[in-house]
Curated annotation (Swiss-Prot):
Species per Swiss-Prot/TrEMBL record: Lemna minor
Subunit-level organization: May interact with Ccs1.
Subcellular location field: Plastid, Chloroplast thylakoid membrane
Family classification: Belongs to the CcmF/CycK/Ccl1/NrfE/CcsA family.
Gene designation: ccsA
Membrane topology summary: Multi-pass membrane protein
Reported function: Required during biogenesis of c-type cytochromes (cytochrome c6 and cytochrome f) at the step of heme attachment.
NCBIfam families: cytochr_II_ccsB
Stated name of the protein: Cytochrome c biogenesis protein CcsA
Length: 324
């Protein structure tokens, strides 16, 4: 009973903290960036990560198995994965971490909100594992797949943002909000201009067009950079996850590959991002061309993760779920 109580407490703590974090992020997005708030944002994400980590450990202890046996647990692990990805630039001391936080923080809160409020209460309970899941491969295979989903989703969202900006007909690029352009935590600092001169420069018609085109180019370059880096990490995790799943399938079902719906869509997902990786190596593959492939992959992942579960058929049918 005490474990269940602790789990509920940590669930509410993590969701409350990340809710405050996203409010802080919106404040720094629409208003001029405040260093103290940015520091609080980072501390909040660390606290969220620790809370979800504690929640998963407690659930592991009282259930007796790694907490990845149903959709609720996988969603909480996915939210934890978004927090991990968010902290990678901080670990590497990367100066442009604000780009990543603009994707990871909303992803983490929406995932956790759906896990806690969108699923039936029965899905929150940790039941007895079906025989096929009673294996040491559970931790390896499922954790790698979920880490890959998190990284690939984040990278694909960068690509979608890149396409929106690239093909936007009006080149205003949210210039109406001067604070957003000058000091936004999402679009980064414009270090090559003196802050006191920014407003006058933007109001100069002769400079405005070239300035916005240059800024648009810089923004697209940043989005392309982050998209390729995060997707490369996710693709590595996906490859490891599929290979470990094949070994596990051979132990459980006597065959490395059975082409059931989950395996088929996992293979389609891997193929899409393999095409993305290949496209990046071609002469004109960077930028919008590879971003189109990654954007397709974004929807393929959701089909693989959620869509197949809705069918409730195949060797992975124990992953089906009921909405509340």
């Amino acid at each position: 009973m005490i474990f269940v109580t602790l789990e509920h407490i940590l669930t509410h703590i993590s969701f409350s903290i990340i809710s405050v974090v996203i409010i802080i992020q919106l404040m720094t997005f629409f208003v001029h960036e405040i260093p103290a708030l940015s520091d609080s944002l980072e501390k909040g994400m660390i606290a969220t990560f620790l809370s979800i980590t504690g929640l998963l450990i407690i659930r592991w202890i009282y259930s007796g198995h790694f907490p990845l046996s149903n959709l609720y647990e996988s969603l909480m692990f996915l939210s934890w994965s978004f927090a991990i990805i968010h902290m990678i630039p901080k670990i590497w001391n990367h100066k442009n971490k604000n780009y990543l936080s603009a994707i990871t923080i909303p992803s983490a809160i929406f995932t956790q909100a759906f896990a806690t409020s969108g699923l039936s209460t029965e899905m929150h309970e940790s039941g007895i594992l079906v025989p096929a899941l009673r294996s040491h491969w559970l931790m390896m295979h499922v954790s790698m797949m979920l880490l890959s989903y998190a990284a690939l989703l984040v990278g694909s969202l960068f690509s979608i943002a890149l396409l929106v900006i690239t093909f936007r007909k009006n080149g205003k690029l949210v210039v109406e909000n001067q604070n957003l352009l000058i000091g936004s935590s999402f679009f980064d600092q414009m270090d090559y201009l003196n802050f006191n001169e920014n407003i006058n420069v933007l109001e100069n018609p002769s400079f405005s067009s070239s300035f916005k085109n240059y800024y648009k180019y810089q923004l697209v370059e940043r989005l392309d950079y982050w998209s390729s880096r995060v997707i490369s990490i996710g693709f590595s995790f996906l490859t490891i996850g599929i290979l470990s799943g094949a070994v596990w399938a051979n132990e459980a079902w006597g065959s490395y590959w059975n082409w059931d719906p989950k395996e088929t869509w996992a293979f389609i997902t891997w193929t899409i991002y393999a095409i993305y990786s290949h496209t990046r190596t071609t002469k004109n593959g960077q930028g919008a061309n590879s971003a189109i492939v990654a954007s397709i992959g974004f929807f393929i992942i959701w089909i693989c993760y959620f869509g197949v579960n809705l069918l409730g058929i195949g060797l992975h049918s124990y992953g089906s779920f009921i909405l509340s």
